[in-house]
Amino acid sequence: MLRSEKPVAVEDIVNIYKESPSIIITHYHGLTVSQVSVLREALKSKEAGFKVVKNTLAKIAANQTGLNSIANLFAGPTAIVYSKEPVEMAKLVVNFAKANDNLKIIGGIVDNHVLDEHSIKELSKLLTLNELRGKIIGLLQAPATQVVGVLQAPSSSMARVIQAYASKN
């Protein structure tokens, strides 16, 4: 990379850090181009991204954005995964890492909280925002359905009694 290109690359990483409250730092050594492409496409469908970064530039960007706490995670062949939705991103990356041993989760940051590999795996077990919304709606609808069932029960029981009496005669 030319010296003149480095400030632009740092600015790109700074923008990612500023716009994405959720970042996972990974090592991608040994992943094939097709595997990286599959991961990028999967992340893109979840409005997330995957960017291979030069460690020194990623550290400079981290220091410029006040994310000094993650600067020590940048060593080796590093790529960052970034998103606005931490749980969906974590699920996708953890599942991809399980299927592809060459992707290693190093750590990350979610809403300025530094996470280690174990914490990211635990995060991936949580429900996503859409799953939580669905569950809450289901819980809110359940009592109404039960009330309707209770109110309809006497009339349906009465109808069965009348039907049984009519069929005897």
Curated annotation (Swiss-Prot):
Superkingdom in the source lineage: Bacteria
GO biological process: one example: translation
One Gene Ontology term of the molecular function aspect: large ribosomal subunit rRNA binding
Keywords: Ribonucleoprotein, Ribosomal protein, RNA-binding, rRNA-binding
GO cellular component terms attached to this protein's record: large ribosomal subunit
PROSITE patterns in alphabetical order: RIBOSOMAL_L10
Function: Forms part of the ribosomal stalk, playing a central role in the interaction of the ribosome with GTP-bound translation factors.
Similarity comment text for this entry: Belongs to the universal ribosomal protein uL10 family.
Subunit structure comment from the entry: Part of the ribosomal stalk of the 50S ribosomal subunit. The N-terminus interacts with L11 and the large rRNA to form the base of the stalk. The C-terminus forms an elongated spine to which L12 dimers bind in a sequential fashion forming a multimeric L10(L12)X complex.
Entry protein name: Large ribosomal subunit protein uL10
Biological source species: Rickettsia rickettsii (strain Sheila Smith)
